[in-house]
Amino acid sequence: MAASLLLRQGRAGALKTVLLEAGVFRGVAPAVSLSAESGKNEKGLPPNPKKQSPPKKPVSAAPTEPFDNTTYKNLQHHDYSTYTFLDLNLDLSKFRMPQPSSGRESPRH
């Protein structure tokens, strides 16, 4: 039943309940309020209006660039053939390091 109560309170409420029930932080004032209500301080009063910054002017959107896909050449997706993997495998085989062997002959399946 306690778990269902924690789930109904949400993350902030569950964390607050766990911290209060744990008894670890008794007598220590919380540095940060765990209240889910935004726009209010610890006493439930609205924030001081003097500290608010003036509203900023909206930034105008950058002009859109013309769309041109005639120069797009993605060879990775468009040059596949039946032997593409084998060709790349042969090209890269000269860069492979030899693998160590245990000295035993590998099983023949």
From Swiss-Prot:
Pfam name, any one: NDUFV3
Keyword Heme: no
First and last residues of the transit peptide: 1-34
Region of interest called Disordered, as start-end residue ranges on this chain: 33-72
UniProt KW keywords: Electron transport, Membrane, Mitochondrion, Mitochondrion inner membrane, Phosphoprotein, Respiratory chain, Transit peptide, Transport
Phosphoserine modifications at: 106
Subcellular location(s) per record: Mitochondrion inner membrane
Membrane topology, as annotated: Peripheral membrane protein
GO BP terms in the entry: mitochondrial ATP synthesis coupled electron transport
GO cellular component, one term: mitochondrion
The keyword Repeat belongs to this UniProt entry's keyword annotation: no
Function statement: Accessory subunit of the mitochondrial membrane respiratory chain NADH dehydrogenase (Complex I), that is believed not to be involved in catalysis. Complex I functions in the transfer of electrons from NADH to the respiratory chain. The immediate electron acceptor for the enzyme is believed to be ubiquinone. May be the terminally assembled subunit of Complex I.
Family per record: Belongs to the complex I NDUFV3 subunit family.
Name assigned to this protein: NADH dehydrogenase [ubiquinone] flavoprotein 3, mitochondrial
Provenance organism: Bos taurus
Gene: NDUFV3
